[in-house]
Curated annotation (Swiss-Prot):
Self-association state and partner proteins as the record states: Homodimer.
Descriptive protein name: Type III pantothenate kinase
Catalytic activity from the UniProt record: (R)-pantothenate + ATP = (R)-4'-phosphopantothenate + ADP + H(+)
Cofactor: NH4(+); K(+)
Annotated organism of origin: Syntrophomonas wolfei subsp. wolfei (strain DSM 2245B / Goettingen)
Domain of life, per lineage: Bacteria
Entry binding sites for ATP: 6-13, 132
Chain positions recorded as K(+) binding sites: 129
Pathway annotation: Cofactor biosynthesis; coenzyme A biosynthesis; CoA from (R)-pantothenate: step 1/5
Amino acid sequence: MILVFDVGNTNTVIGVYDREKLLNHWRIRTNPQRTCDEYGILLRSLLENDKLNLKDIKSVVISSVVPTLMMELEWMSRKFFACRPLVIGPGVKSGLAIKYENPREVGADRVVNAVAAYDKYGGPLIIVDFGTATTFCVVSAKGEYLGGAIAPGIIISTEALVSKAAKLPRVELQRPRSLIGKNTVSSMQAGIMYGFVGQVEGIITRMKTEIETTPQVIATGGLAAVIARETDVIDKVDEFLTLDGLRLIYEMNRG
């Protein structure tokens, strides 16, 4: 079995695969202070709760945008699973031609998403990942990673608004009854929800114009389903896109 880690700035998603089958997944808070032993104990608990044996994990794959966690996760892999993890980064085969000016600048999560989306849906593609940042990645029909856009994520944008405007409360991200809010909470919900829907629609429309083709638009990330319900520019929400990409890259680099 393969254990995969998608370490984001806010959350870490962990999945366990038996060949191509995702047996289970877990979402935990990303904590840069967590030690390798704490990760190991946590994983033992999660696996045993699902009747999975720690000894059945033969490989570990890690994608992380938090550099300070890498050493602890590598140590955890060696100590608890007796294996050297595959860390997504420069030198790891992805099957994509990276057309960035400096390919090393492309985040591991963006590469992983592109690999999975191209494998599952073909190209051309626009991949939108709703994470701490909202990222837009373009993949050509030939499997070239052409680049993309990075915008502030929904949660951090909302937190910035609340922290800088003393009278504004924290609100739940949900569809308001009306775009024209009748109180502070509904007005904030309207602005946040439809502000981000408009951002997604605007960027995707402009990208389609620039690449002069009609790509499929695949969305992933914690809030993908929420935004996708409010717009018709997203063709499909794929909750496990990143985890699937980690498994695919492992297969490319195995042996």
